Amino acid sequence: MGFKLYARNYGRSAFCLSGGAGFGYYHLGVIRELLDRRLLPPIITGTSAGALMGAIVCTRTDEELRQVLVPELANKIKFVHDSLIAHIARYATTGAFFDSDQWCRLALWFCRGSLTFKEAYERTGRIFNVTVVPDDPHSPPKLLNYITAPNCVIWSAIMASAAIPGVSSRHVSSMYVCRLTGPVNPSF
C-alpha cells in the first residue's frame, strides 16, 4: 500500500509527446518501435499534436496499435487541408488559420470517438495525460487524466490543448464531459 501511495504522490516516468504538427509523424515512428520491442510505457503525456498522437496509443490495445500503426497511416494524417489563400481568408473572417471542424474530425478518429479518460484507461490500462492552459492567464496549466478529469471526453481535451490564439478558434477550448446518462455536454 505504501509504495502505491508513493508512486501516486511522487509520480512515475512518462513518455512525453510534444506539440507541433511536424513532430506527429516522428512520434508515431517512435511509438511503433517501442511497441514492437514491448517497451511502450504505461503513462503517456501529450500537448497539442503530441496529445493527438498520444490518443492513438491510449485508446487502443497493443494488437489494435499493430494494425493501425502502419505506413499508410501517414496518408490519414493531414494537419493542413487548405491552401494558403484559404487560411488567410479564414483568418480574416474567424481569427483562426485552421478549420476547427476538420481538426475535430481528425481528433475523433484518433480517439476512437467520444471516449473519456476513464473509459480509455479501463480499456487499455494506459494512463493518458493531456495538458491544457486555462483562459485565465493567472491560472496554472491543467493536467487532465483518468484521475483528475475521468469523464472528460479526450478529443475535446486535445482540441483545448491545441487552442492557440490565431491558430484555431477559441470555441474549441471548451472541454466536454460525458454524463453517466445522456449526451456529451460542454463543461469546463
Model-derived segments and their meaning:
Residues 1-44, 58-188:
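Patatin-like phospholipase
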Residues 45-46, 50:
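Gly/Ala-rich beta-loop-alpha elbow adjacent to hydrolase catalytic centers
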Residues 51-59:
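Short glycine-enriched nucleophile-adjacent loop
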